[in-house]
Amino acid sequence: MGRSISVSFGLLVVFLSLSGTGADQDCLPGWSFYEGGCYYVFDVKTWEDAEKFCQKQSNGKHLATIEWLGKANFVADLVTLNSDPRLDWIGLRVEDKRQQCSSHWTDGSAVSYENVVHNTKCFGLDQKTGYRTWVALRCELAYHFICSRVPR
């Protein structure tokens, strides 16, 4: 009984911290506040369309960036509360169009030829890893995505 109450209370605290603080920090309705930013999980788009959507909807902001462990945990909790198991885009992408993989092979030689089946220059979060590690995904596929913006 005591453990059940403790778990229920813990889930309530997480839910309130993700959903209730948005209004307190001048986030738009439904957006969640964390460390000076507002975050929202949207329905599926390709990586490029998701980034354009975030820029348009979020006054020039972008897909969510994850610069430290605390934010990674916040984003993972936000995605977990807002979805069934799935993949979600974040704002990470390989910008060098010529380079699919690492710039060097394990023997130290430079990558001058690639034979990769799919374009995996975009990154997202995977439910299989608890949404806490980044996975390379095909940019042209549509997944849910997390936008970030500054409070109003």
UniProtKB/Swiss-Prot annotation:
Pfam families cross-referenced by the UniProt entry: Lectin_C
Signal keyword on record: yes
Broad class of the protein's primary localization: secreted
Tissue localization of expression: Expressed by the venom gland.
Disulfide bonds: C27-C38, C54-C147, C122-C139
Single GO molecular function: toxin activity
Superkingdom: Eukaryota
Signal peptide: 1-23
Gene3D superfamilies named among the record's database cross-references: Mannose-Binding Protein A, subunit A
Every C-type lectin domain range: 34-148
Oligomeric and partner information: Heterodimer with the beta subunit (AC W5XCJ6); disulfide-linked.
The protein's role, per its UniProt record: Inhibits human breast cancer cells (MDA-MB231) migration and proliferation, as well as their adhesion to fibrinogen and fibronectin. This inhibition may be due to the binding to receptors of the integrin family, probably alpha-v/beta-3 (ITGAV/ITGB3) (40% inhibition of cell adhesion) and alpha-5/beta-1 (ITGA5/ITGB1) (by comparison with lebectin).
Protein name: Snaclec lebecin subunit alpha
Organism: Macrovipera lebetinus
